[in-house]
Amino acid sequence: MVSESHHEALAAPPATTVAAALPSNVTEPAAPGGGGGKEDAFSNLKKKFMNELNKIPLPPWALIAIAIVAVLLILTCCFCLCKKCLFKKKNKKKGKEKGGKNAINMKDVKDLGKTMKDQALKDDDAETGLTDGEEKEEPKEVEKLGKIQYSLDYDFQNNQLLVGIIQAAELPALDMGGTSDPYVKVFLLPDKKKKYETKVHRKTLNPVFNEQFTFKVPYSELGGKTLVMAVYDFDRFSKHDIIGEYKVAMNTVDFGHVTEEWRDLQSAEKEEQEKLGDICFSLRYVPTAGKLTVVILEAKNLKKMDVGGLSDPYVKIHLMQNGKRLKKKKTTIKKNTLNPYYNESFSFEVPFEQIQKVQIVVTVLDYDKIGKNDAIGKVFVGYNSTGAELRHWSDMLANPRRPIAQWHTLQPEEEVDAMLAVKK
């Protein structure tokens, strides 16, 4: 006992001495486990997670596989998003670069074009000496209308000008099929009284005519005239289109020999359709009797043909088939009027089987005591007719034994003759 107490007594002072020897600002090291709060929390979460994981009724390898798949899906989504963003940025950058180089605002284009045009005009004006009030004419491209070959000769013995229309070539195509139906009108200016025209050649751009026309003109008067050769495209359903024309001043031609030459067609001046007047007549057909009755009722606003500003009109009626005149009738002459009233009836025998093959041609003429009676205008109904004329003929056939009256606009004689010459 004594020895133990003595032992304790001996051991105590050194402990006190050690404690006193430590500096006052030194902290005593923490006991193990006292400063590991974070590690404990992580351990607890880990234990809970493992406990929850153990509760899932799946083997560990299955859970690992699911985790790997989930990670792969997440990585794939991230990759796609990144790629899409990069692609958009690339396109945007490319678009900006392209826009900066090529895409120009329309307003900028207009302004730039206007500025450049104004500057160019100023430069041109400065070079040519044009003022602001003057305009510089731009050179127009010459339109190719084809060419025509013709011949000219003069018969001094009979005082006749002989005009030959030989052929045309390289005409422009005016029809939808890539061709034209050309014919040529020939007349002398300034009177335009006597007009000729060639036959219509179907579906060709290089027609060969080989036709000759004669004008009775004294040589002393020939020098003041101009020959016009106008090439037209025939159209059954509308006005004929002019392709081009060529004019020859007679005072420039040497009639000491026959002239034959090719010349390029030139653009023709558009002339307004001359108003020739209107005529009213009725048609009546009786199929059982084979009788066709035409009643010429009246005409109005006829073209002035005489010097006094009037005319002496009368009407000719022709029954035609296949270009041949089968019968001819005519009205009385009405003196000094442009609005004659006739009310004259004419009958023709036409069998029922022939009624669809015939034509009634109505021509209004101006009577002249001295010279030839000039045609004012013309119209025809029946086979190969069109428009109002075809409608009138159809109405007559649809209403047998009943007279059908209708007004018709007179057409130039040469145009109607051209239509009559066309065979279907």
UniProtKB/Swiss-Prot annotation:
UniProt keyword DNA-binding present: no
GO BP: calcium-dependent activation of synaptic vesicle fusion; cell differentiation; regulation of calcium ion-dependent exocytosis; regulation of synaptic vesicle exocytosis; vesicle-mediated transport
* Gene Ontology CC annotations of this record: axon; chromaffin granule membrane; dense core granule; exocytic vesicle; plasma membrane; synaptic vesicle membrane
Which residues are noted in the entry as Ca(2+) 3-binding? Answer: 235, 238-239, 241
Q: Where is the composition biased (Acidic residues)?
A: 124-136
Record's superkingdom? Eukaryota
State its location(s): Cytoplasmic vesicle, Secretory vesicle membrane; Cytoplasmic vesicle, Secretory vesicle, Synaptic vesicle membrane; Cytoplasmic vesicle, Secretory vesicle, Chromaffin granule membrane; Cytoplasm
- Keywords carried by this UniProt record: Calcium, Cytoplasm, Cytoplasmic vesicle, Differentiation, Glycoprotein, Lipoprotein, Membrane, Metal-binding, Palmitate, Repeat, Synapse, Transmembrane, Transmembrane helix
Gene3D superfamilies xref list: C2 domain
Q: Which cofactor does it need?
A: Ca(2+)
Q: Main localization of the protein?
A: membrane
Q: Which residues bear S-palmitoyl cysteine-type lipidation?
A: 77-78, 80, 82, 85
Q: Matching PANTHER family, A to Z?
A: SYNAPTOTAGMIN, SYNAPTOTAGMIN-1
Could you identify this protein by its name?
A: Synaptotagmin-1
Q: Which organism is it from?
A: Gallus gallus
Q: What is the lineage of its organism?
A: Eukaryota, Metazoa, Chordata, Craniata, Vertebrata
